[in-house]
Amino acid sequence: MKNEINAVLENMTTATPEPEDYTGEDGLLYCGKCRKPKEAYFAPDKAAIFGRDRHPAECDCQRAAREEREAAEKRRRHLDTVEELKRRGFTDPTMRDWTFENDNGRNPQAGIARRYVEHWEDMRADNIGCLFWGGVGTGKSYLAGCIANALMEKEIPVHMTNFALILNDLAASFENRNEYISRLCRYPLLILDDFGMERGTEYGLEQVFNVIASRYRSGKPLIVTTNLTLDDLRNPEDTAHSRIYDRLLSMCVPVRFTGENFRQETAQRKMESMKKLITD
């Protein structure tokens, strides 16, 4: 034990010289590159305790190297955290590519999505969600994914899923139904994609209501994308849909998506590329 203590003291109190280092007029070891001391004298009372008169000190070179190592380690931990958030947060790996950086810049609602991320803390504090509604292929899901990716890059947990998957999970899971829904509601932001496309059975509608009502009670924001019109949501066909839509509209600010169908455009571009390849 005594030898171990001595080894610790030795490491604590002895600076390791490099070939270019030198001893200054004050008797301390100096860095041969930055010309700053690598040692400092103990106060007299500390010197008596350690039995030495000096201890290592960081020169500018050592400090810069340490800060670089710490920054690299911080970046690594950040990347690991973001990777884990995206692994848990996305139900489809392609959603990882739905980012503002990959956006074609032609969707006028992109600015709203960007500002939602920029003002996330306010949105979270005031429990402000969004209802992205509009025609098929107008970029609703993509921009919701952009929000998810941007927040997860800030190490904020987000879960993006749809009710078809939720209903399948509830039917297949051994987990308690209430615990499953509670887990969904623990995410700071929940994104429900393609709302209204799930099967309209009595059981399905009841679970849809349970999820949305639980999210409402959690006081946390919700983003929903749907092909339903605002008129559909405000004038539901029956009571079962009415209580779902009413709760949804109380939580989310409607944002209309109009314009070109980006999916059709992508399909047309792929068709033209294929024609070119097979006719060349």
What does each of the following model-derived ranges do?
Residues 194-195:
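Walker B catalytic acidic pair
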